[in-house]
Structure formats: C-alpha cells, structure tokens
C-alpha cells in the first residue's frame, strides 16, 4: 500500500537529483540566468510606488469607500491637526493670546495642504445687531489693548456651547488650534506630494510634510512659555508612517538580519552558509516587488509583512538544504554527489512546503481589503521564487570549494562526524523519550488542547490604533492628554440627506439631526458634537439679542431660509463645513476619545438602535468619515484574516491528502499544524490579550510556517519507514536525518522574530513575540506530538520488520 506513494516521491526526488547535477555542471549558466531574472525583477520593481493612504485598503467599488468619496465631494477633507496648549495665566491671558494670534497666522501661511486654521484669535463669532440683524466677524479682528477688554470677550465666548470643549476648555486653562486640511489619507499619491517632482518618499508626502511644518513652527522661540500637545489625524498618521516605515522597520530588519547572520555563522561556520540563504531571500524579495511593479500595484501598508515572511521561508529552505548537504559532503566526500543526494531527499518536501505556503497565502486573496489581497499574491510569488533560488542559486554557492576525498582516513571521518554530535545525540534521546512515553504525550497534549479551546472561547477581537504606539512615542501621550481634557481626537460623521435641494432648511430635518445629536452625546466616549443645528440655534439666539430662550431651531422653513441668507450676507462661512452646496445634505460630526474599536463601534450601534426604535421620517442618514472608514477597515481585515486562516487550513489539508494520497495521513499531519495556533490563541484568551487586526495575521502565517516543518518530518518519516518497515527505527532515522535542520531553522526564526521586542510599535512587538512562540510550539508539536500520533495510529501501514522490544537504538 505504500508503493505508489513511495514511487511518486522517489520519482520527484530523481527529478530534483537531476536538477542538482545539471546546476552543478552548468553553474555559470545558472548564475547568469539568475542574475538576469534578478535584474528584470529590479527593473519591474522600479515602477512600484509607495502608497500608505487609506485608499490602498479599499477597492473603488466598495460601498463604504464610495460613501466616503461622496462625503468628500460634498464637504472636503475631515482630517485635522489638533493643537492643544497650556500656559501660565490660561487661554485668556493677553500675552498668550498674542502668541496664539501669531501662531495661527504662521500655520495658515506656512503649513502645506492647509485649508483653514481656527483658534480663539480668529474664530467666527456671531451676535445680534438690533433690531433685526446680526454681526458675524472674526473674534479678535480688533485685538484688545488690555486684559480687561479680553475678559469681556471671554465672557461672551464662554456662553456659547459651540466653542467650549473644542477651542477652549470649560475652566479656560487650555486652548486649542484646529488646523483643517485640504487633503486626506484617501487621496491618491499624485495629489499629496509637496514637490510634484520630489518622488513618493514619505518626507515629500502628506501628512508627513504638514506634520513636520507644524512641529517646526511650534518649536520656535517666540512661543516659549506655551506647552503644546499636538494630536489629531495629521500628527497620528504622520507619526505612524514615519516611525513604522522610516525608523522602526529599517532598524528591525537590520537587527533581524544581524541576528540571523550570526546564527548561520554559528551553525555552518562558512561563508556559503550565510551568503547563500540571504541571496535566496534577496532574490525572493526582488521577485515579489517585481510582481508588484508588473501588475501596477503600489507598495502599501501590508508590504511590511512581506520581508518577515520571505526571510522565514527562504532561511528555512536554505537551512534544510545546507544541513543535508553537510551530512552527505562528509559521507561522500564529493560536492556534486552530495548536492544530487541532498536534492533527492530535500527537494520534494521543499517543493511541497513552498506550494502549501503559497496556497495558504493565496487564500487571503479573497479578502475585501485590497492591500491584504495584494499581499497574498506577491508573497506567494516570493515563496515560489525562494524555492527556485534554493535549488539553483544556493546550489551554485555549494558547488564552489575544495572536494573532500571519499576515502579519507578514519580519523578525518570521525572528526567530521563529531560536528553536530551533541545535537544529534539530543535528538536521538528525544526519539527514545517519545517512544517510551507516547501515551503520556498524547494525554498531555489532549489536556492542553481542551484548556486552549476554553481559552479561545474567552478571546475578544478588538483593535486600538493609538496603542499601536509604545508609550515612548510622544503622540500617544499627547493624544491621551487631549482626549482627557478637550474634545476627542477620533471623528465619526453622519450625513443626513433630505432628498432635495434646500431640504435641510426644513425644521423637521433639523430636528431629526438634533435628535440623533442628543442621542450621540449620551455616549460616554463622545466628548463633542458639531452640526448645522448648533449654528442655526446660535443664529436664532443672536437674532434675539442673545436670549438663551431662543437657543433652538426656528419654527418654519421660511425663517430658517431667511436666517441663513442674512448669515451668509453678513460674511458667515462656518456653516459651509456642515452643508452641501445645494443644501440637500448636512453633517453631524462626533468627536470621540480614541480607544478600542469595539467601544467606538458601540457608538454606531447605539445610534442604530435609536434609529430602529425611532426611524427618521424627513431624511435618510449614513455613517461615514475617516473614523468610520477605519472601523470598517478593521472589521474587514479582522474577518478576512479569520476567513483566510480557515481557507488556508482547508487548502493545506487537501494538499497534504493529495501529496500522501491518503486522507488519514493528510488529516493526521494537520494536527501538529493547528496545534501551535490553538495553543497560542488559547494562552492569549486566558491572559486576557485581545486579537487585533495585527495579531490576527498570526494564524495564516503560523499555519504556513508550521506546515513546512511538518511536511519535512512527515515525508522523511514516510521515506524511512518505506526503507526500514519499522515505525520506531524510522523515527530514529528521521530525527537523525531531518531533525537537526528542523531545530536549527526554528531556533534561527525564533531568535529572528524576537528582535521585534525592540520595536517602538507595540503591535509589531507583540506580533514578533507571538510568532516566535508559535514557531517554538510548532517545533515541540512536530518533535513530540506528531511522532506519538504516528506510533499510535500507524498511518503508513503495517510494519514489515518486527520491532525490538527495547525502545533504545
């Protein structure tokens, strides 16, 4: 019953054996061809652009994205820079106000992509002009001469709810400057360059250029004595892009390369043992970026995952080939023969691991998140490129060097054999342990599985963009301060559509907006709301000489239209932020504290429940804005990763069944593959660690990496059983043959991923720690659980040689 499977694997092995011999004999042709492909990939990669905007996540036909584009057409960008300040004397100190007036002008004149800047020095103010008119003017058009004059203005402003909490705190200790932007994170890269010819590097793009300009202005000596807390969309997004792509990622990549290099030197102790694997990884990366350029995609947010994945795959393939080559080089003393024998044994499992890993990644191509779907395709291409490079470029590197005589003296043979003796002895002891305690191992894993399943039931899916930053990053601290003391830094927008031009002038529509606004204000996370209703009430009150009894919506459509006409003729412009040009649509903006997406989603759900209970009659409403777009993105990526993991698991299971032509073996091999994910997720559940959009990447990545080790060990075990006909002897032979490579690969990857602990991004840090844990658990499962299952279930068929009663070898 094992014959056909054995013949298939042997036949595939002979193909790779021939490839190894041909590559050795024609190494210069292989090298030239490889560099030609490399050069072509580099040429194609030069056409790829960097685009980390929100637009990189959504397809143009996505309804949520389409709604946001409609909102942008009506109301322009909703992104802001929010600068809260504190100084001796408070926000209404005359000297401080002079500095803020100067700051406001500087921001308007010098910051790229600014639409408008509002502070206490220039905020639009409205008051009555009896008997039947109003005055609309900038607050400090005529700057007060004395502190007393400024206090008179203060008393007027503090009576207006529109300003309190947004431009000035209720106790007047804090003030704020709001920098409205003309661009947003969804805009194409062509529209956010500062210098049209300056390229697509982050320093030339919005919001980085705007953030840098604001920071430079705030640090000028003329503003000494004022403490600034710079937050808002511009500060948060610019910091994220800069820290992740220009500061954190290059350092972590360099550190990871250094650690992996030192590990390879320690293990192989020769240049080819280091240069070869990195040439494989570099080739795979070049092909991946070349695919991006060929298809016409952009390098986006998710691209940062690709180097990590390809390092793992490329190093794993290389270590298996190098380890096997070392064994046969010592045994045969001839490089060509050692290469042929190595590829005969390692080539088929490397191909299978590459195919299953690529298939696992391709399962993510069904994601509604554009950048995730793209990552799936170019990562799969990189995985296959790493495999091709492993059996060609790496072979070329191994072909160089002195030949070792196969008839070397026994003394030299023993000296070579001592290399790796300690690890080999440990692996043999491990095999003995599994044989002796296989039942205990199975029971222990079963108990851990049950406990992990319980832990998984306690897992929550949640994300918090702010806590992606470590507390060392200033923008995290400033944002938390702003959220605690002023209006929030997170924005959710509701758009009310009356269905007709001038329909917003209908009092019934305005009352519906007011009703939803009051409902939103009941939520603990909503710190401030803005709508056309606030302005209409202010206009009505101003027409009645500031009488608070008239801080209400006018009774008739005609009166609303008259008030708006007078307001605009008086120079009022603020209302344009809340009304479409045809008066058909109006916005309600909620400013919220930046916190977990589940809590922010609770705001939307509360309003949805209110609208279900009390439906709108005069208008329709939709939720949008950059904040709502982010909530939708997190929802998309969360469930697409869960879906992707399930698809990857199914695809890999089917491939394992096909490879071994056995449902039993295929399903059996998946137990050690899913065990790392189950155990780690269960541990997270018990520890109260939630799954965010970043940590959710662990499952499909872990399955892709875990299956590699399983395939290598399973195929070797199957091969050795076919030769020996004895499960115990086959286990010893398998651990001796492939165990060393599995241990070395896993150890190198664990150390490499643990370099993420030095990240200043907490999300990246936790991802590295969890992925290292998954790899370590996967190795334990492959070394303990899988052999115990095979010894118990005997999936390769009956033994043909009676096993010794002793468990020792």
For the regions a protein language model found, what residue spans apply to each?
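Hydrophobic transmembrane alpha-helices
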Residues: 261-265, 281-282, 298-319, 362, ...
């Amino acid at each position: 019953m094992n014959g056909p499977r054995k013949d298939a694997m042997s036949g595939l092995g002979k193909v790779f054996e021939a490839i190894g011999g041909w590559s050795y004999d024609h190494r210069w042709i292989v090298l030239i061809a490889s560099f030609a492909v490399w050069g072509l990939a580099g040429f194609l990669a030069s056409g790829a652009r960097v685009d980390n905007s929100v637009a990189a996540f959504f397809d143009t036909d996505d309804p949520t994205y389409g709604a946001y584009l409609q909102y942008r057409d009506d109301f322009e960008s909703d992104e802001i820079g929010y600068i809260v300040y504190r100084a001796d004397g408070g926000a209404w100190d005359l000297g401080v106000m002079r500095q803020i007036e100067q700051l406001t002008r500087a921001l308007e004149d010098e910051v790229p992509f600014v639409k408008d800047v509002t502070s206490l020095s220039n905020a639009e103010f409205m008051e009555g002009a009896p008997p039947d008119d109003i005055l609309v003017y900038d607050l400090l058009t005529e700057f007060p001469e004395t502190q007393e004059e400024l206090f008179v203005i203060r008393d007027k402003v503090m009576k207006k709810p529109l300003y309190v909490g947004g431009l000035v705190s209720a106790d007047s200790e804090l003030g704020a400057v709001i920098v409205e932007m003309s661009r947003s994170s969804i805009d194409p890269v062509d529209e956010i360059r500062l210098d049209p010819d300056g390229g697509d590097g982050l320093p030339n793009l919005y919001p980085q250029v705007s953030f840098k300009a604001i920071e430079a202005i705030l640090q000028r000596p003329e503003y000494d004595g004022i403490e600034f807390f710079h937050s808002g969309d511009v500060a948060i997004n610019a910091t994220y892009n800069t820290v992740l792509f220009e500061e954190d990622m290059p350092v972590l990549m360099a550190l990871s390369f250094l650690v992996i290099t030192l590990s390879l030197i320690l293990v192989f102790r020769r240049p080819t043992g280091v240069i070869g694997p990195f040439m494989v990884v570099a080739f795979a990366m070049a092909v991946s970026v070349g695919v991006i350029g060929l298809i016409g995609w952009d390098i986006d947010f998710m691209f940062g995952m690709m180097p990590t994945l390809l390092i793992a795959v490329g190093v794993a393939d290389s270590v298996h080939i190098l380890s096997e080559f070392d064994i046969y080089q010592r045994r045969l003393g001839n490089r060509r023969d050692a290469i042929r024998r190595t590829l005969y044994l390692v080539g088929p499992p490397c191909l299978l691991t590459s195919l299953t890993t690529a298939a696992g990644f391709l399962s993510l191509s069904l994601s509604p998140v554009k950048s995730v779907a793209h990552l799936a395709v170019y990562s799969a291409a990189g995985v296959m490129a790493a495999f091709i490079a492993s059996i060609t470029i790496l072979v070329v590197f191994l072909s160089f060097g002195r030949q070792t005589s196969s008839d070397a003296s026994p003394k030299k043979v023993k000296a070579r054999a001592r290399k790796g003796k300690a690890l080999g002895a440990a692996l043999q002891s491990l095999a003995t342990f599994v044989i002796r305690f296989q039942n205990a191992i199975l029971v222990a894993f079963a108990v851990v599985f049950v406990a992990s399943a319980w832990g998984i039931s306690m897992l929550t899916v949640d994300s918090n963009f702010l806590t992606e930053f470590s507390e060392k990053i200033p923008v995290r601290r400033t944002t938390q301060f702003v959220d605690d003391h002023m209006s929030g830094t997170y924005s959710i927008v509701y758009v009310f559509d009356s269905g007709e031009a001038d329909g917003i002038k209908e009092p019934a529509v305005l009352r519906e907006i007011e009703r939803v606004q009051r409902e939103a204000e009941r939520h603990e996370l909503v710190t401030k709301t803005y709508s056309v209703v606030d302005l209409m009430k202010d206009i009505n009150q101003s027409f009645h000489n500031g009488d608070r009894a008239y801080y209400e919506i006018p009774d008739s459509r005609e009166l609303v239209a008259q008030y708006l006409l007078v307001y605009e003729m008086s120079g009022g412009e603020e209302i344009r932020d809340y009304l479409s040009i045809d008066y058909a649509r109006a916005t309600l903006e909620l400013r919220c504290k930046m916190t977990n997406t589940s809590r922010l989603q609770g705001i939307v759900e509360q309003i949805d429940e209110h609208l279900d209970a009390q439906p709108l009659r005069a208008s329709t409403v939709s939720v949008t804005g950059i904040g709502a777009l982010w909530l939708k993105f997190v929802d998309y990526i969360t469930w697409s990763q869960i879906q992707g993991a399930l698809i990857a698991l199914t695809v890999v299971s089917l491939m394992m069944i096909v490879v071994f032509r056995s449902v039993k073996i295929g399903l059996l091999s998946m137990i050690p593959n899913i065990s790392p994910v189950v155990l780690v997720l269960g541990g997270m559940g018990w520890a109260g660690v939630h799954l965010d959009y970043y940590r959710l990447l662990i499952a499909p990545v872990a399955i892709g990496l875990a299956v590699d080790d399983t395939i290598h060990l399973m195929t070797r075990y199957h091969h050795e059983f076919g030769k020996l006909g004895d499960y115990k002897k086959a286990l010893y032979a398998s651990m001796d043959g492939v165990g060393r490579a599995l241990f070395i690969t896993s150890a190198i990857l664990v150390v490499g991923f643990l370099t993420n602990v030095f990240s200043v991004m907490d999300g990246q840090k936790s991802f590295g720690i969890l992925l290292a844990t998954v790899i370590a658990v996967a190795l334990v499962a492959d070394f303990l659980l899988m052999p115990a299952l095979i010894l118990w279930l005997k999936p390769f068929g009956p033994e043909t040689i009676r096993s010794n009663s002793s468990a020792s070898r």
